[in-house]
Amino acid sequence: MPELPEVETSRRGIEPHLVGETILHAVVRNGRLRWPVSDEIHALSDKPILSVQRRAKYLLLELPDGWIIIHLGMSGSLRILPEERPAEKHDHVDLVMSNGKVLRYTDPRRFGAWLWTRELEGHNVLAHLGPEPLSDAFNGAYLREKCAKKKVAIKPWLMDNKLVVGVGNIYASESLFAAGIHPDRLASSLSEKECELLAQAIKAVLLRSIEQGGTTLRDFLQSDGKPGYFAQELQVYGREGEPCRVCGTPILAGKHAQRRTYWCRRCQK
């Protein structure tokens, strides 16, 4: 599933081609996504795009009278293409733009979403979200406060959007390795220093992934069709049995809350 770096990479890739341009019309080839594509998106016509923003794993296209909310789901990606490029099997939604280009949404598993809302505030998919991990609001002190009485393993707690948004399975594993913290540790057992290290590790790992265009393991592509190159820098995720890049110990794998987790037994305590 695309996580924060992949969604932010998509935002940065499409923004220069959309802001200041007008949506001439939408083409919805298959509206049966996680939720049906909103009727207002089917009917789009002559709508300028004012901004392209991101909240958590949602892309937000601001129009004069409302917002398009896009979620990439498990296998979605967005590309900027020439208008004349023929659609392929899994290309479900196009926004045809005034500059001769299309914003094309591709999603083999159809678990993404295209929603419409007049107002962002209070929309059910955006309500009750924690802070952005790259914001000043997310820091060691905040993490310590939220972990202090939490009797759950730190790995699944990091993936809870009420704690912090956008940190999915890949980046939770990578951040815990960078901070030297075992994924089985109870959140409440983390010291003030460990919380500070973990907050900084999360920021550093996410920023590095954004620099590399995100992580492509299967379906994700950047807006120009290229894969994300952070996959080449993964320290533990997907490397079961391979030697740790730091100490040489074989990487271990297990499950936490039904999600695959990877760690080094020597580097993470």
Swiss-Prot record:
Q: Where does DNA bind?
A: 90, 109, 150
GO MF, any single term: damaged DNA binding
Q: What InterPro entries does this protein map onto? A: DNA_glyclase/AP_lyase_DNA-bd, Formamido-pyr_DNA_Glyclase, FPG_cat, MutM-like_N-ter, Ribosomal_uS13-like_H2TH, Znf_DNA_glyclase/AP_lyase, Znf_FPG/IleRS
Q: Which GO terms describe its biological process?
A: base-excision repair
Tell me which cofactor or cofactors this protein depends on: Zn(2+)
Active-site residues are 2-3, 57, 259
* Segments forming FPG-type zinc fingers: 235-269
As recorded in UniProt, its EC number(s) are 3.2.2.23, 4.2.99.18
Record's superkingdom? Bacteria
Q: How is the cofactor bound?
A: Binds 1 zinc ion per subunit.
One matching Pfam family: Fapy_DNA_glyco
Q: Which reaction does it catalyse?
A: Hydrolysis of DNA containing ring-opened 7-methylguanine residues, releasing 2,6-diamino-4-hydroxy-5-(N-methyl)formamidopyrimidine; 2'-deoxyribonucleotide-(2'-deoxyribose 5'-phosphate)-2'-deoxyribonucleotide-DNA = a 3'-end 2'-deoxyribonucleotide-(2,3-dehydro-2,3-deoxyribose 5'-phosphate)-DNA + a 5'-end 5'-phospho-2'-deoxyribonucleoside-DNA + H(+)
Which keywords does UniProt give here?
DNA damage, DNA repair, DNA-binding, Glycosidase, Hydrolase, Lyase, Metal-binding, Multifunctional enzyme, Zinc, Zinc-finger
Family indicated by similarity: Belongs to the FPG family.
What functional role does this protein have?
Involved in base excision repair of DNA damaged by oxidation or by mutagenic agents. Acts as a DNA glycosylase that recognizes and removes damaged bases. Has a preference for oxidized purines, such as 7,8-dihydro-8-oxoguanine (8-oxoG). Has AP (apurinic/apyrimidinic) lyase activity and introduces nicks in the DNA strand. Cleaves the DNA backbone by beta-delta elimination to generate a single-strand break at the site of the removed base with both 3'- and 5'-phosphates.
Q: How does it assemble?
A: Monomer.
Name the UniProt record assigns to this protein: Formamidopyrimidine-DNA glycosylase
Q: Which organism is it from?
A: Cronobacter sakazakii (strain ATCC BAA-894) (Enterobacter sakazakii)
Question: By which gene is this protein encoded?
Answer: mutM
